[in-house]
Amino acid sequence: MNQACVHNDTIDVGNHHGRPQCRPFLQFLTTQERNVIWLLLAIAFLPVDGTTLGLYAPFWSPISPALFAVYCLCNWRQLRIAANRYLLMFLLPVACIILSIPGWLKFGIHLNAAFMSITGLLGVLATLGAIAIAFDIKRIPWRTPLRILIASYWFSFGVGVVQWLSIHLHIKPLAGYFAHLMYRQYINESSVWGGGRPQFLFAEPSYIGMHLFGVLLPLMWLMRGRDRIYAKRLRNLIVVYAIGSVLMQAGTRIVLDSVVALLVAIIVHNSWCDKKQRVRGIAQLLGAVMLGLLGVLADSRLSSIAENGAEGDGSFFARIYQSLDPICGLLAHPWTVLTGYGAGNIINAVWAGAQHAGRLLNDLGMNGSAAVGFAVGISNHLGR
């Protein structure tokens, strides 16, 4: 697929380093099949994964996977080729169902949760299939889709700036609009997850790092050997997005994610066999660590964690016990280490592991009742 991308620039080579213009875009559309619009829409909506306009899924509401699926269906002949090339990936839903059968027989099946688990895997395959069809099989020019991707992320950053202004300038009608637009809003004071933070168009502020370092950064690395201008544009987008998010105090995770990404970049970009580069790399690593420490001091939540441990921040501690419950559930039924509890049955793992997780947290000097209370709360919510 990477080799295909090198050759996929025959149509829109004109003025590709200049600003995006309507003429190259229209030329691109006229030289491609009509169904390419579904691909372009899916790419444009990649930064939009937390609005009420998307399809509901646990912890996010994406739009792009459905559009990628439509593009795949429009190109079903090529989809068969893509499925053969990436057969192991396309067998994931089948493997998931087969492995889930023992858990379903033992613990029952939660139909809605199982459906969302399996459709989540189908969304992954739709995304993989659409990208393979477009850039590996059809080999469409990649510059126009990349322009759209960069523009859409700049737009989402602009939305975050407007959200931040609406919060700090107390523009309640605007803040209220965004609060209603987002499926789980972090905008105003009524948020049960902690308001007063811009979330751009993401499901949570903590998703910022996932987009920057899970989508844009790999693309930047791919572009380095193909087009330095686009690599630079992606780099500038990542840097501005990360710094802007930190300055606007959008979340704690972006501080940690940025430091980790910086450390990785320093390690990759230095030749550690060369003495001069080794000295420079060590200095850069020390500088990155200092930036991380400054980030901890500047962020109240990170400072609280550093001072009081895991329980210093409620959100951070919740991630610990909410993860520990199902992990301990594997210990309650060791055979589930091989098969799991079945797709959609993570709640059964939570119930089975809550007591053990509570004891473990108590032994570590933390509040073990939180792990038990989480499982009890879910039981009450489901009416058990």
Q: What residue spans do the PLM features occupy?
A:
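A membrane-periplasm/extracellular boundary helix in multi-pass inner-membrane enzymes
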Residues: G158, L165-I167, V264-G312, L331-A332
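Membrane-interfacial entry segments at the cytosolic side of transmembrane helices
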Residues: I140-L149, Y230-N236, C273-G287
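N-terminal membrane topogenic signal
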Residues: G18-W38
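Membrane-embedded alpha-helical segments of multi-pass membrane proteins
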Residues: Y56-N75, S117-T127, I208-L216, D257-V264
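N-terminal hydrophobic segments of proteins, predominantly signal-anchor/transmembrane helices
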Residues: R34-T51, P65-A130
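Long extracytoplasmic/lumenal interhelical loops at the membrane interface
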Residues: S304, G309-C328, P334-R384
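Alpha-helical transmembrane segments of multi-pass inner-membrane proteins
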Residues: L146-A179, S190-G195, Q199-A250, V255-N270
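Juxtamembrane membrane-water interface segments that cap and precede transmembrane helices
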Residues: A44-T51, Q185-L201, Y321-Q322, N362-G383
